Amino acid sequence: MKHLLSTHDLHRGAAIQILDTAEEMASVTEREVKKLPALRGRTVVNLFFEDSTRTRISFEAAAKRLSADVINFAAKGSSVSKGESLKDTAQTLEAMSADAVVIRHGASGAPQRLADSGWIDAAVINAGDGTHEHPTQALLDAFTMRRHWAKIFGVSSVGSDVAGMRVAIVGDVLHSRVARSNVWLLHTLGAQVTLVAPPTLLPIGVQTWPCAVSFDLDQTLDAGVDAVMMLRVQGERMHAAFFPSEREYSRRWGFDDARLARLDALGLDETIIMHPGPMNRGLEISSAAADSSRSTVLDQVRNGVSVRMAALYLLLSGGLQQPDQSNPQRNVTNTSNWQETKR
């Protein structure tokens, strides 16, 4: 597997391999000298056509901790702002012998186009394309969930998936590439996913996704959840009124102080609250929830570096598993590690 473009196409074996490799990379981030020589002499280009803070810095840190040379490219202030095409930009990077291109683009499908075009021979990693996908965010979210459950049950997370976990993804699903990537990856890893949103913020065809759909957050919490992932309301992508008011949205679909207390009342002591960031505090999540002991927001940021180190290393070393078409069972990981313990 040369590229990482979508979790839809990521088979179970490769996903587990990335998560397990990320565990090894996490030990590097805990050292005083956070550096490995694994990608020395390789060049990684961060090609960002959209604004980003967390993802760009995370990929830069990941590449540098593997000793790769990093080139940061931003569309603003570059020839792209003068009308240069993606093809011309890609061919320029090819002439500079880039080994990997991490691309974020406002157009859904741009990373796939770059990977399939033949314009560049580098590995391509999708860092978010339009409202389509954001695979490394989903991987770091799964990594965070897997680690949390392993800690609870006192077992190693290595080799395990998240089978049996109940995950609610709440909010602006329509505009969220994070939601799409998480639905596909978590389904592959065995989790039970429920999307919770107003009808106006659910995409057409969501009924075909491998998840349940609910319009009632309180009802979903009452049914029991192990992780609640709040999504940012993406006002910059909204050109119509998708809900009556921010107050109404927060009351019905925001994770406020009352819902934080509701988890305690329901006895859901180990339920975690997640958010991919950036957060709209007071809209989809209250400050009390974001800063609570249940929150994994900073863990997600921390884990993102380890997961992206793993992705870069496996893609550039050629070590990422290919699906075994002759024996599909080899792509299925044993999930009994803590599922038996949980029972």
From Swiss-Prot:
A single GO molecular function term of this UniProt record: aspartate carbamoyltransferase activity
Alphabetized UniProt keyword annotations: Pyrimidine biosynthesis, Transferase
Domain of life of the source: Bacteria
Pathway of action: Pyrimidine metabolism; UMP biosynthesis via de novo pathway; (S)-dihydroorotate from bicarbonate: step 2/3
Gene Ontology cellular-component annotations: cytosol
Region (Disordered): 323-343
Entry EC number(s): 2.1.3.2
PANTHER family: ASPARTATE CARBAMOYLTRANSFERASE (PTHR45753:SF6), ORNITHINE CARBAMOYLTRANSFERASE, MITOCHONDRIAL (PTHR45753)
Assembly description: Heterododecamer (2C3:3R2) of six catalytic PyrB chains organized as two trimers (C3), and six regulatory PyrI chains organized as three dimers (R2).
Protein name: Aspartate carbamoyltransferase catalytic subunit
Gene: pyrB
